């Protein structure tokens, strides 16, 4: 059965104030209140950082409707972490700068921009797992697999110190890909950069 609406782009336009409210409510939910306009809008993006995702069409931010996927991830500052011992309030600026440094080294990075919606500061990241198809009429999701999935490891073992995949495992998988030399070089350069 073919999904309904996959072959078109549909979204509800959002103003800057709408986005500010959406971002504010990510970190400060009010008991008993909800934004009914967003009730059908649910996303799941891994990671510890507060984030959401939206659709951008011809310069207009939108809430995707139906089968239309998001195109950009909005990441809020981390703030105080580790029982208030570390202040990562500048995480938006830090991640933006790191992406510029990695790009300068020749590594492929997602397009990032810093943006402000009212008093909400965010890093806007263009999703690398999306492609416009059919002359831009709709957006295709590109399935992704991380190295835990590729090696059959459970998510709780995502770090090498916990028994997750290490450099040798990753290089072995990359060697079996369609661009083994290029992928291996990018991986090695990224290890050097970090």
Go through the PLM ranges and name each one:
Residues 1-194:
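Phosphate/dinucleotide-binding and metal-coordinating scaffold of catalytic cores
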């Amino acid at each position: 059965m073919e999904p309904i609406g996959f072959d078109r782009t549909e979204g509800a336009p959002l103003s800057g104030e709408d986005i500010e409210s959406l971002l504010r409510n990510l970190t400060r939910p009010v008991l008993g209140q909800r934004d009914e306009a967003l009730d059908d809008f649910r996303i799941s993006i891994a990671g510890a950082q507060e984030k959401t995702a939206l659709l951008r069409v011809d310069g207009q931010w939108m809430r995707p409707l139906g089968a239309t996927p998001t195109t950009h991830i909005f990441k809020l500052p981390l703030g105080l972490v580790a029982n208030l011992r570390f202040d990562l309030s500048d995480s938006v600026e830090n991640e933006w700068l790191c992406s510029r440094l990695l790009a300068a080294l020749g590594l492929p990075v997602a397009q990032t921009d810093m943006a402000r919606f009212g008093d909400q500061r965010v890093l806007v990241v263009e999703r690398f797992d999306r492609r416009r198809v059919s002359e831009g009429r709709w957006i295709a999701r590109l399935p992704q697999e991380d190295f835990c999935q590729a090696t059959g490891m459970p998510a709780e073992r995502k770090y090498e110190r916990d028994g997750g995949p290490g450099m040798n495992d990753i290089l072995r998988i990359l060697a079996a890909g369609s661009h083994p030399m290029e992928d291996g070089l990018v991986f090695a350069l990224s290890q050097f950069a970090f």
